[in-house]
Amino acid sequence: MRGSSITLEDYTLEEGLRIFRDAGFDTIEMWRPQLRRCKTDELRKKFVAYAKGMGILMGGLNVVGEDYYQPFGTDQQLEQTLTNLMADADFALSLGTRDVLIWEGVAPKGTTEAHWMSQLLPRLIELFRTATNALRSKGVRFLVEPHPFTVGMSDQFLIKLCDALDPGQFGITFDFCHYGVGRPNDYLEAIPALGHRIRNIHFSDTDQKTSELHFPPGAGRLQIQAMLEAFRGIHYDGTLALDLYAYPTPVQALPLGAARVREACEFLGLPY
Protein backbone atom coordinates (compact mmCIF):
# COMPACT_ATOMS: atom_id res chain seq x y z
CA MET A 1 0.00 0.00 0.00
CA ARG A 2 1.31 3.38 -1.05
CA GLY A 3 1.48 6.67 0.85
CA SER A 4 2.94 10.14 0.39
CA SER A 5 5.64 11.19 2.86
CA ILE A 6 4.56 14.84 2.71
CA THR A 7 1.62 13.71 4.84
CA LEU A 8 4.05 13.56 7.77
CA GLU A 9 6.19 16.59 6.90
CA ASP A 10 6.55 17.57 10.59
CA TYR A 11 8.14 14.26 11.56
CA THR A 12 11.69 12.98 11.17
CA LEU A 13 12.36 10.44 8.45
CA GLU A 14 12.65 7.66 11.02
CA GLU A 15 9.41 8.62 12.76
CA GLY A 16 7.54 8.97 9.48
CA LEU A 17 8.63 5.58 8.18
CA ARG A 18 7.62 3.88 11.43
CA ILE A 19 4.21 5.55 11.44
CA PHE A 20 3.53 4.57 7.84
CA ARG A 21 4.71 1.00 8.42
CA ASP A 22 2.58 0.60 11.51
CA ALA A 23 -0.46 1.82 9.55
CA GLY A 24 0.10 -0.88 6.93
CA PHE A 25 1.99 1.01 4.19
CA ASP A 26 4.90 -0.57 2.34
CA THR A 27 5.66 1.97 -0.42
CA ILE A 28 6.23 5.71 0.01
CA GLU A 29 6.47 8.64 -2.41
CA MET A 30 9.26 10.70 -0.86
CA TRP A 31 9.05 14.49 -0.69
CA ARG A 32 12.45 15.92 -1.62
CA PRO A 33 12.76 18.50 1.23
CA GLN A 34 12.53 15.65 3.74
CA LEU A 35 15.67 14.16 2.19
CA ARG A 36 17.75 17.34 2.56
CA ARG A 37 20.29 15.52 4.75
CA CYS A 38 20.78 12.82 2.12
CA LYS A 39 23.26 15.02 0.28
CA THR A 40 25.25 12.28 -1.44
CA ASP A 41 24.44 9.22 -3.46
CA GLU A 42 25.98 7.08 -0.71
CA LEU A 43 23.72 8.59 1.96
CA ARG A 44 20.66 8.12 -0.22
CA LYS A 45 21.50 4.47 -0.71
CA LYS A 46 21.90 4.08 3.06
CA PHE A 47 18.50 5.68 3.59
CA VAL A 48 16.90 3.36 1.03
CA ALA A 49 18.50 0.35 2.75
CA TYR A 50 17.23 1.58 6.13
CA ALA A 51 13.70 2.00 4.76
CA LYS A 52 13.82 -1.42 3.10
CA GLY A 53 14.86 -2.93 6.41
CA MET A 54 11.64 -1.53 7.85
CA GLY A 55 9.63 -2.99 4.97
CA ILE A 56 9.27 0.30 3.07
CA LEU A 57 10.06 0.71 -0.65
CA MET A 58 10.46 3.95 -2.60
CA GLY A 59 7.48 4.84 -4.83
CA GLY A 60 8.65 8.06 -6.47
CA LEU A 61 10.28 11.42 -5.73
CA ASN A 62 7.96 14.39 -5.15
CA VAL A 63 9.57 17.69 -6.20
CA VAL A 64 6.36 19.70 -6.59
CA GLY A 65 6.85 23.34 -5.64
CA GLU A 66 10.64 23.52 -5.88
CA ASP A 67 11.79 27.14 -6.35
CA TYR A 68 13.86 26.32 -9.42
CA TYR A 69 10.83 25.27 -11.46
CA GLN A 70 10.15 28.38 -13.59
CA PRO A 71 9.28 27.12 -17.09
CA PHE A 72 7.33 30.26 -17.98
CA GLY A 73 10.07 32.72 -17.03
CA THR A 74 13.06 33.94 -19.02
CA ASP A 75 15.04 31.72 -21.36
CA GLN A 76 17.69 31.50 -18.63
CA GLN A 77 15.08 30.38 -16.09
CA LEU A 78 13.83 27.76 -18.53
CA GLU A 79 17.36 26.43 -18.95
CA GLN A 80 17.87 26.36 -15.17
CA THR A 81 14.56 24.52 -14.82
CA LEU A 82 15.77 21.85 -17.24
CA THR A 83 19.12 21.50 -15.48
CA ASN A 84 17.51 21.05 -12.07
CA LEU A 85 14.81 18.75 -13.43
CA MET A 86 17.53 16.49 -14.79
CA ALA A 87 19.29 16.58 -11.43
CA ASP A 88 16.07 15.58 -9.67
CA ALA A 89 15.71 12.68 -12.09
CA ASP A 90 19.16 11.46 -11.06
CA PHE A 91 18.17 11.96 -7.41
CA ALA A 92 15.11 9.76 -7.95
CA LEU A 93 17.20 7.08 -9.65
CA SER A 94 19.60 7.07 -6.70
CA LEU A 95 16.60 6.15 -4.54
CA GLY A 96 15.81 3.26 -6.85
CA THR A 97 12.67 4.82 -8.34
CA ARG A 98 11.98 6.02 -11.87
CA ASP A 99 9.12 8.43 -11.14
CA VAL A 100 9.58 12.18 -10.63
CA LEU A 101 6.43 13.92 -9.41
CA ILE A 102 6.34 17.57 -10.48
CA TRP A 103 3.73 20.16 -11.31
CA GLU A 104 3.30 21.49 -14.82
CA GLY A 105 3.49 25.16 -13.85
CA VAL A 106 1.73 27.95 -11.99
CA ALA A 107 -0.49 30.04 -14.27
CA PRO A 108 0.96 33.58 -14.52
CA LYS A 109 -1.36 36.15 -12.99
CA GLY A 110 -3.77 37.80 -15.38
CA THR A 111 -3.33 35.25 -18.18
CA THR A 112 -6.04 33.35 -20.03
CA GLU A 113 -6.35 29.79 -21.27
CA ALA A 114 -5.79 31.09 -24.81
CA HIS A 115 -2.44 32.53 -23.69
CA TRP A 116 -1.51 29.26 -22.01
CA MET A 117 -2.22 27.34 -25.19
CA SER A 118 -0.37 29.65 -27.56
CA GLN A 119 2.57 30.78 -25.42
CA LEU A 120 3.11 28.42 -22.50
CA LEU A 121 2.28 25.00 -23.95
CA PRO A 122 5.12 25.06 -26.51
CA ARG A 123 7.63 25.89 -23.76
CA LEU A 124 6.46 23.00 -21.59
CA ILE A 125 6.55 20.57 -24.50
CA GLU A 126 10.10 21.69 -25.30
CA LEU A 127 11.14 21.33 -21.65
CA PHE A 128 9.79 17.83 -21.11
CA ARG A 129 10.66 16.56 -24.58
CA THR A 130 14.29 17.58 -24.03
CA ALA A 131 14.34 16.00 -20.57
CA THR A 132 12.65 12.75 -21.58
CA ASN A 133 14.83 12.34 -24.67
CA ALA A 134 17.97 12.77 -22.58
CA LEU A 135 16.72 10.35 -19.91
CA ARG A 136 15.15 7.74 -22.17
CA SER A 137 17.85 5.12 -21.56
CA LYS A 138 17.44 5.54 -17.78
CA GLY A 139 13.69 4.90 -17.85
CA VAL A 140 12.72 8.07 -15.97
CA ARG A 141 9.05 9.07 -15.99
CA PHE A 142 7.65 12.50 -15.12
CA LEU A 143 4.19 12.69 -13.55
CA VAL A 144 2.70 16.19 -13.53
CA GLU A 145 0.22 17.04 -10.78
CA PRO A 146 -2.24 19.85 -11.59
CA HIS A 147 -3.15 22.19 -8.74
CA PRO A 148 -6.06 24.66 -8.53
CA PHE A 149 -3.72 27.47 -9.64
CA THR A 150 -1.72 25.69 -12.37
CA VAL A 151 -2.26 25.55 -16.12
CA GLY A 152 -3.05 21.82 -16.06
CA MET A 153 -6.50 22.45 -14.58
CA SER A 154 -7.38 22.99 -18.24
CA ASP A 155 -8.11 19.56 -19.72
CA GLN A 156 -7.40 20.90 -23.19
CA PHE A 157 -3.95 22.09 -22.14
CA LEU A 158 -3.07 18.92 -20.26
CA ILE A 159 -4.22 16.60 -23.03
CA LYS A 160 -2.14 18.41 -25.64
CA LEU A 161 0.89 18.36 -23.34
CA CYS A 162 0.61 14.64 -22.67
CA ASP A 163 -0.10 13.71 -26.27
CA ALA A 164 3.05 15.51 -27.42
CA LEU A 165 5.23 13.28 -25.24
CA ASP A 166 6.09 9.60 -24.87
CA PRO A 167 3.39 8.04 -22.63
CA GLY A 168 6.00 5.69 -21.22
CA GLN A 169 7.90 8.66 -19.85
CA PHE A 170 5.17 11.18 -19.07
CA GLY A 171 1.78 11.13 -17.41
CA ILE A 172 -0.56 12.73 -14.88
CA THR A 173 -0.96 12.48 -11.12
CA PHE A 174 -4.66 13.10 -10.47
CA ASP A 175 -5.06 14.57 -6.99
CA PHE A 176 -8.62 14.26 -5.68
CA CYS A 177 -8.25 17.31 -3.43
CA HIS A 178 -6.80 19.57 -6.12
CA TYR A 179 -9.52 18.76 -8.62
CA GLY A 180 -12.22 19.13 -5.98
CA VAL A 181 -11.03 22.68 -5.30
CA GLY A 182 -9.92 23.70 -8.79
CA ARG A 183 -12.84 22.09 -10.64
CA PRO A 184 -15.62 22.08 -7.99
CA ASN A 185 -18.46 21.65 -10.48
CA ASP A 186 -16.96 19.26 -13.02
CA TYR A 187 -14.15 17.30 -11.38
CA LEU A 188 -15.91 14.07 -12.33
CA GLU A 189 -15.82 14.99 -16.02
CA ALA A 190 -12.05 15.47 -15.89
CA ILE A 191 -11.46 11.75 -15.28
CA PRO A 192 -12.83 10.37 -18.59
CA ALA A 193 -11.50 13.42 -20.44
CA LEU A 194 -7.92 12.72 -19.32
CA GLY A 195 -8.41 8.96 -19.44
CA HIS A 196 -5.34 6.80 -20.00
CA ARG A 197 -3.02 9.76 -19.46
CA ILE A 198 -3.60 9.48 -15.71
CA ARG A 199 -0.95 7.16 -14.30
CA ASN A 200 -1.03 8.00 -10.58
CA ILE A 201 -3.76 8.97 -8.12
CA HIS A 202 -3.36 11.01 -4.95
CA PHE A 203 -6.29 9.71 -2.96
CA SER A 204 -7.86 12.20 -0.57
CA ASP A 205 -10.90 14.40 0.03
CA THR A 206 -11.52 18.12 0.41
CA ASP A 207 -13.88 20.76 1.73
CA GLN A 208 -13.80 22.13 -1.85
CA LYS A 209 -12.76 25.52 -0.48
CA THR A 210 -9.25 25.23 0.93
CA SER A 211 -6.44 24.67 -1.54
CA GLU A 212 -3.86 22.06 -0.49
CA LEU A 213 -5.87 20.80 2.50
CA HIS A 214 -6.16 17.05 1.96
CA PHE A 215 -8.86 15.37 4.05
CA PRO A 216 -9.00 11.59 4.53
CA PRO A 217 -11.15 10.00 1.80
CA GLY A 218 -14.77 10.17 2.89
CA ALA A 219 -14.23 12.99 5.40
CA GLY A 220 -14.86 15.84 2.96
CA ARG A 221 -17.38 16.82 0.29
CA LEU A 222 -16.24 14.88 -2.77
CA GLN A 223 -18.30 12.18 -4.46
CA ILE A 224 -15.58 9.61 -3.81
CA GLN A 225 -17.51 6.58 -5.01
CA ALA A 226 -18.56 8.34 -8.21
CA MET A 227 -14.91 9.26 -8.84
CA LEU A 228 -13.82 5.67 -8.33
CA GLU A 229 -16.55 4.51 -10.70
CA ALA A 230 -15.23 6.98 -13.28
CA PHE A 231 -11.74 5.54 -12.87
CA ARG A 232 -13.08 2.02 -13.26
CA GLY A 233 -14.84 3.24 -16.39
CA ILE A 234 -11.50 4.17 -17.99
CA HIS A 235 -9.99 0.82 -16.87
CA TYR A 236 -7.47 2.60 -14.67
CA ASP A 237 -4.38 0.47 -14.04
CA GLY A 238 -1.88 2.91 -12.56
CA THR A 239 -0.84 3.54 -8.96
CA LEU A 240 -2.79 5.03 -6.04
CA ALA A 241 -1.28 6.74 -2.99
CA LEU A 242 -2.90 8.20 0.12
CA ASP A 243 -2.15 11.93 0.46
CA LEU A 244 -3.11 13.76 3.66
CA TYR A 245 -0.93 16.84 3.14
CA ALA A 246 -1.86 19.73 5.49
CA TYR A 247 -4.42 17.69 7.43
CA PRO A 248 -3.97 18.66 11.11
CA THR A 249 -4.09 15.14 12.59
CA PRO A 250 -2.46 12.89 9.99
CA VAL A 251 -1.32 10.16 12.38
CA GLN A 252 -4.85 9.74 13.70
CA ALA A 253 -6.21 9.74 10.14
CA LEU A 254 -3.77 7.24 8.62
CA PRO A 255 -5.55 4.03 9.71
CA LEU A 256 -8.87 5.30 8.31
CA GLY A 257 -7.10 6.43 5.16
CA ALA A 258 -5.43 3.04 4.83
CA ALA A 259 -8.79 1.30 5.02
CA ARG A 260 -10.16 3.57 2.30
CA VAL A 261 -7.10 2.87 0.12
CA ARG A 262 -7.66 -0.87 0.42
CA GLU A 263 -11.32 -0.49 -0.49
CA ALA A 264 -10.48 1.72 -3.48
CA CYS A 265 -7.80 -0.64 -4.77
CA GLU A 266 -10.10 -3.63 -4.44
CA PHE A 267 -12.83 -1.75 -6.31
CA LEU A 268 -10.42 -0.80 -9.12
CA GLY A 269 -8.65 -4.15 -9.20
CA LEU A 270 -5.30 -2.62 -8.23
CA PRO A 271 -2.66 -4.33 -6.11
CA TYR A 272 -2.03 -2.93 -2.64
Question: PLM features: residue spans?
Answer:
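Glycine-rich, proline-tolerant flexible connector loops at the mouths of alpha/beta enzymes
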Residues: 29-52, 107-108
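Histidine-acidic metal/acid-base catalytic patches
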Residues: 1, 7-24, 96, 155-174, ...
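A short acidic, helix-capping loop that chelates divalent metal ions and anchors anionic groups
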Residues: 67-73, 108-115, 180-182, 209-214, ...
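Catalytic-core regions built around general acid/base machinery
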Residues: 42-53, 124-135, 190, 226-230
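Hydrophobic residues within beta-strands of alpha/beta enzymes
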Residues: 28-29, 59-61, 100-101, 201, ...
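Active-site beta-loop-alpha junctions enriched in small/polar residues
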Residues: 4-8, 31-35, 63-66, 105-107, ...
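Active-site acidic/histidine proton-transfer and metal-coordination neighborhood
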Residues: 12-15, 52-53, 70-171
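Flexible, glycine- and charge-enriched loops at secondary-structure boundaries
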Residues: 13, 37-44, 74-82, 113-121, ...
